[in-house]
Amino acid sequence: MEDAAIREGFDHLRPGSDYDKLYDAAVCRAGADWLIGINATRLFSVLYGVTLNVGRVMSPTLALLVQRESDIESFISKPFYVPEITCGGFTASGEKMTERSEAEKIRMDCDHNSAFVRSVEKQVKTIQPPRLYDLTTLQRECNRIYGYTAQQTLDYVQSLYEKKLATYPRTDSQYLTKDMQATAASLILWLRDNMTFGKGYAGEPDIDRVTDDSKVTDHHAIIPTVEIARTDLSELPSGERDVLTLLVVRLLCATTQVHRFEAVTAILDCQGYTFTAKGKTILQSGWKEVERIHRMSIRQSETEHKENEAVALPVLQEGQTFEAVSASLREGKTSPPKHYTEDTLLSAMETAGAEDMPEDAERKGLGTPATRAATLEKLVSAGFVPRKKKQLIPTTTGRNLIAVLPDNIKSPILTAEWESMLKQVEHGELSATSFMDQIADMSRTLVCLLYTSPSPRDRSV
C-alpha cells in the first residue's frame, strides 16, 4: 500500500462492530465447509470401504473434470469439407459441408473458371489492452506459458511479495486505486526505459484505464513494485523471475496504446457459388508489440498465439474479375472438447454456478483465488486427478466417486445457495445460528438418507 492510502485509512477508521456481520458470514462459511466435509467424507468412506474426500468446492470441481472426460469419450468425430478457390495470391473459402460429393461438385464446377468480387467490406477494429492480473488470471497465464501449477505460481508470487518485489497476491481485483496512480506511472516509465519489453511501449501511460476504486475490495491487482529498480533480477530463482516478468509485461500492456487494425471481408462469386476471403492490416500495434517482444524473449511458438487472423488481402474492388481460378477441397474432422488444463479449469471454476448467485455476492464460482490452487492439489494428492503433462484427467476412482455422490454435493448450485444465504447473514437478514442450523440439518439428512438406504458397501469405487 502507498503511504497516502495508509494515512487515508487511519483517518477514516470505522468501529470494529461495523464488521461483526461480515465476520459472522466468514465464520459460517468456514464452519459449513467443515461440517459438510467431515460428515460427507466419513460417510462415503465408510459406505465404500476406501477413503473418499468430499467437499463443497472439491467435489463440484472434480465433477467438472469428469463431465469433460465423458464429453470427450462420447464425442463422435465427423468429417467436413470446405471448397476453396485461389485467385490473385489469396484463398477464399466456401461453406463447410458434411457431404463430400456436394463439396466435390462445387470444386469441379469452379476449377479453371472465372470468379468476380461481389462485395468488399472494410472495418477498423480495436482490441483493448488486457486487464491487470488478479491471482487466478496470473495462475492461468503461468500454466499456459510456463506450465507451472496453480500452487507453484502462488508460491512464486508469495515469495516475490515477501521480497517486496510484488504487491499482495491473494486478490480477485484487476484494478488499482486512485491513490496509486502517481507511483504506478513513475514505475511504468522506469520499466519502459529499462526493460527489454519497454521497446514496444508507445505513448504515455494510461493509468485511468486500470484505475477503479469501486472494483477494488480487499486488495488491488497484482503489479511489480518500485523495488524492482534496485534488484538484480538474474539472482532470482527462475520461477520467481518468470512470474515477475509476466507482472511487468502485463503492467506495460495494460497501460499502453490499444491494438488497431483494418479487417477486410471480400465476398466472391464463382459459378453462382459464394466464397469468402478475410484479411487484416495492422494500423497500430499498441500493446501487442510489448507482448510480441516478450514472446520472442521466451522463444514461444507463434502458433500458440494465432488469433484466427488472416494475412492482409491485396487491394480488391467490387466487380473485379479473376480468370481461371484454382479450386481445391480442404478436408477436416470435427474435434472433441479438449482436456482441462489448470489454465482452463481455473477459468471454469471462476464461472461455475455464477449465474445462480446473487448479483452482489462477494464470491462467485468455485472457491476463491486464494483457495483454488489448494483445491487442485487436494484432488491430485487424493488420487482423483493425476497430472499428465499439462492435462488434468480424472482417474477411475474419481469418476466413480462422482457417479455415487448426490447431485447437490457435486453441483456448484450448492455454493450458489450458500453464498446467497451468507449474503443475508452479512446484511443482518439471517442469523448465523439459523444458517448453521440449516447446514446441520442438511448434513443429518445426507447421512440418514444414504446410510440407511440399501447398502452400497458391496460396490467398489
Question: Whereabouts are the PLM-identified features?
Answer:
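Toprim catalytic domain recognition across nucleic-acid enzymes
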Residues: M1-G353, M357-F384, K389-L392, T396-N400, ...
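Leucine-rich, amphipathic alpha-helical/linker segments
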Residues: I207, T211-K215, P412-V447
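Conserved small/polar residues in nucleotide/adenosyl-binding loops
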Residues: Y451-D458
